[in-house]
Amino acid sequence: MSLSADVMAATKFSEEQLAKYVIDATKEVFSTMVMMDPADEYPLQEAVNRFKCSITGMVGFAGIYSGVISIHCPVNLAMKITSNMLGLECDEVNEDLNDAIGEISNMLGGSVKQVLSKGGLDVKLSIPTVIAGEDYTVNSLSDSDCVVIPFKIDDDKFLVGLVLKKED
C-alpha cells in the first residue's frame, strides 16, 4: 500500500513525509490525551484489512481532498486507551470505549487536515464512525492511495491508516 504519484504531486508531500505527519500526530495525541507513548514500526510489512476482536475508528475528509483516517486496535488495547483517556476503568466494549476511539480518530483527522490544508478551511471532517467486532474486514476502494503505519505500546499493536484522493 502506498500513495500514487498523483496524490503525492497534489499534496506536495512524499509518502514518507505524510507518514511522518501521521506518526507525529499519533504520538502527540497519545502522549497528551492517553498518557501512552506508542512506538511506530513504519513501514508496514504486510497489508492488513481483516481484524479480529478489534475496534476501528474512522473520520472522513471532504473538500479539496477526500479520504479517511482510521485507527484499528485490539479491544484489549482499546480498553487500556479508554481507561487512560477517561480516567476510569473500562473492561468491556461500551459507549465510553466507542467515544474514546472515535475521539482519537477525530483528533488524528484534525491534525492531518491542518497539514493538507492551509488553515484547514478547504477540507472538512466527517463525524467519527466506530466499528467493533469479533471478525470484520475494512476495505478501501483506493488501496493504491493508502499509507498504513503500525504502532506498538508494550506488547500491543495497532494501526493508523490514511487513504487520500485529490479532488478535481
Feature-to-residue mapping (PLM):
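N-terminal auxiliary interaction/assembly segments of multi-subunit proteins
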Residues: 1-168
